[in-house]
Regions:
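Alpha-helical segments in transporter systems
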Residues: 30, 52-55, 63-88, 110, ...
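Juxtamembrane loop-to-helix connectors within ABC transporter transmembrane domains
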Residues: 39-41, 50, 58, 128, ...
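Transmembrane helix-loop-helix hairpins at lipid-water interfaces of multipass membrane proteins
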Residues: 47, 65-127, 204-209, 320-324
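Helix-loop junctions and hydrophobic alpha-helical segments within the transmembrane domains
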Residues: 58, 147, 151, 260, ...
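Transmembrane helices of ABC transporter permease
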Residues: 64-77, 114-117, 184-237, 309-322, ...
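Helix-loop-helix
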Residues: 96-103, 109, 202-219, 286-359, ...
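An intracellular "coupling" helix at the cytosolic face of ABC transporter transmembrane type-1 domains
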Residues: 156-157, 173-182, 186, 190, ...
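ABC-type nucleotide-binding domain
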Residues: 366, 373-374, 378-626
């Protein structure tokens, strides 16, 4: 049955629902909790709370902000003073009310003074712009730091249920939107308010009746602005949500580009991208259209107001109840009075975009961090590597149990293997040993101490992992290996590489250990990346080792090479092996066969073959394929 565009659109909406708060990854039972209900998308925080919290990041720069806002006051006063100076210049030197001739020398002197006043305003405006830019960037540094620091404290569960692309969108798009508001919008709101107050005072001083005419339109302008702001807020939140969904899809597609090409999924990917892209376009149009309506509406009302004021002012001049200089200045003030109102109204879209972005950033900051260590948690130095699981029961969701009554005992230096079908719970067990998740019942103990009573850093410092999905950081080969133990010497790094059988290929690289790796080690083969991962585990000197299908993604020849490194790595370490190829676990001290979250068989290779149970069928089936 063919899949229609409507079907794909429905699928995308389901997959990316609630992207504003979370973006579930599709992961199996053995790899993580899998898709969960969207969190927080339908209950955004209040605008006032987001604004108050955002302003707290400016408190450290109160002095610079104070100077900047003082400069705003100077600029506003200079602008208003310069504008009002036109009245005496016109009435005294250009068109005196008594009909006497003008005065060129006086005109030149008056214009020079007015230019000096405006120059003072220009200097103040430059200082204000520079200072607010520094304040905004300092605030962004603090926001990014808090966001990144918080993300280091979040549990693995958070990353299992959130899209990398959406999280990156919060770091980039949302934070940049906040920066734009802090650097310019705040000042424009303050200067606009100040201009309105100052202009209104001078308008009243110039002519109270024309001021009354000008103010007639203000309630209508405020009502229009409030209505547009009210309607546009929800659309700006939807826009940020759609942007996060699109970024998440792009990140997933680029990361999985090989899979896309292998399954000839290019056209489908383009179609799904088009659906998300068009959805973003529609939401952006709605948000930007409503936000952009503010300017034209205000301008039209301002033009009507200007025309009405000019007509009435002209009549007053004709009947000699007003002077030409006063009318000129007042018309200029009426423009200045409506301009900040227009500017403030046009900043509404920026404000709501920034607040929507702030809500998304703060939603990550407000996530529950990894549970703190118990008060009686102990430090463990020199672990021997004795691991005991006693009647462990666990589920990523309490109502869906994955591991049922798991018990096992590993003596220091033993090799324990887990085999079973995909989704049986093999990786979940290793996640629990690392305490990436807390169990529902039972105990996990290392060297006789419940891991809940061991400080997390100490626990994980004594456990090294080599995963199927290798990950290398941008940097030198030396730095990537040393990531396993930052205080390792160069000699220890080289020794670890030799133990992992990686030294020979490293020395063939252009700069040896100083060769800079591209993102995720893209300039190395899969096997070479895995050897560096093994070297990283070796340099850590951890007494407990976890190998999660470490050779399943390489060819047989490379696998033999990697196995040599792993054999040396496993010596004198308690090792837990998740096996894809059963030939790699034949020499394990104990093999645990898992099915549906339960250990259905256990024993060494020979004993399990004699039982002719599940392991026997798996092994002989593999042998026949080979």
């Amino acid at each position: 049955m063919s899949v229609t565009r409507a079907d794909r659109e429905a699928s995308l909406k389901k997959r990316y629902a609630g992207r504003v708060a979370a973006a579930p990854k599709r992961r199996g039972m053995g790899r993580g909790p899998g898709p969960g209900a969207p969190r927080g998308g339908g209950r955004p925080k209040s605008t006032g709370a987001a604004l108050k919290r955002l302003m707290s990041y400016l408190e450290a720069d109160r002095l610079r902000m104070g100077i900047a806002f003082f400069c705003v006051i100077v600029n506003t006063v200079a602008t208003l003073t310069g504008s009002y100076m036109l009245r005496p210049i016109i009435n005294r030197f250009i068109a005196p009310p008594d009909g006497s001739p003008g005065n060129v020398a006086g005109l030149f002197k008056g214009l020079t003074m007015m230019a000096c006043v405006y120059l003072l305003g220009v200097i103040a405006n430059y200082l204000q712009s520079r200072l607010m830019l520094e304040v905004a960037q300092s605030a962004l540094v603090r926001i990014r730091t808090d966001l990144f620091t918080k993300m280091q404290k979040l549990p693995v569960r958070f990353y299992d249920t959130n899209s990398n692309g959406d999280l990156m969108s919060r770091f980039t798009n949302d934070v940049d939107t906040i920066g734009n508001m802090l650097s310019s919008t705040l000042v424009q709101l303050f200067s606009g308010t100040l201009s309105i107050i100052g202009t209104l005072f001078l308008m009243l001083y110039t002519n109270i009746w024309l001021t009354a005419v000008t103010l007639i339109m203000i309630p209508l302008m405020l009502r229009a602005g409030g209505e547009v702001a009210k309607r546009s807020q929800k659309y700006f939140s939807a826009q940020q949500s759609a942007l996060g969904a699109l970024n998440g899809y792009i990140e997933e597609t680029i990361t999985g580009q090989k899979v896309v090409k292998v399954f000839c999924h290019e056209e489908i990917a383009e179609e799904e991208f088009d659906i998300l892209n068009r959805d973003l376009r529609e939401k952006q149009i709605r948000a930007q259209f409503l936000g952009g309506m503010m300017g034209p509406v205000m301008n039209n009302l301002s033009q009507v107001n200007y025309s009405l004021t000019a007509c009435i002012g002209g009549i007053l001049c004709v009947v000699k109840n007003f002077d030409v200089g006063g009318l000129t200045v007042f018309l200029n003030f009426s423009r200045q009075f409506s301009r900040p109102i227009n500017e403030i109204s046009m900043q509404v879209s920026n404000v709501f975009s920034a607040l929507a972005g702030a809500e998304r950033v703060f939603s990550v900051m407000d996530e529950e961090p990894e549970a703190a260590d118990d008060k009686d948690a102990v430090s463990m130095d020199g672990m021997r590597g004795e691991v005991v699981l006693d009647h462990v029961t666990f589920g990523y969701n309490p109502d869906k149990i994955i591991l049922k009554d798991i018990s096992l005992y590993a003596r220091p230096g033993q090799k324990i293997a887990f085999v079973g079908s995909t989704g049986a719970g093999k990786t979940t067990i290793t996640n629990l040993i690392n305490r990436f998740y807390d169990i529902q019942s039972g105990t996990i103990a290392i060297d006789g101490v419940d891991i809940c009573h061991i400080k997390r850093d100490d626990l994980r410092r004594h456990i090294a992992m080599v995963l199927q999905d290798t990950h290398l950081f941008t940097g030198t080969v030396m730095e990537n290996i040393r990531y396993g133990r930052l205080d390792a010497t160069d000699e220890e790094v080289v020794q670890a590489a030799k133990m992992a059988s990686a030294h020979s290929f490293i020395m063939r690289l252009p700069k040896g250990y100083d060769t800079v790796l591209e993102s995720d080690g893209a300039n190395l083969s899969q096997g070479q990346r895995q050897l560096l991962n093994i070297a990283r585990a070796a340099v850590s000197k951890a007494p407990i080792l976890i190998l999660d299908e470490a050779t399943s993604s390489v060819d047989t020849r490379t696998e033999k090479h990697i196995e040599q490194g792993m054999d040396r790595l496993m010596a004198e370490r308690t090792t837990f092996v998740i096996a894809h190829r059963l030939s790699t676990v034949r020499n394990a001290n104990a093999i645990m066969v898992l099915e549906n979250g339960e250990i259905i068989e256990r024993g060494d290779h020979e004993d399990l073959l004699k039982e002719k149970g599940r392991y026997y069928r798996l092994y002989t089936g593999m042998a026949e394929l080979n």
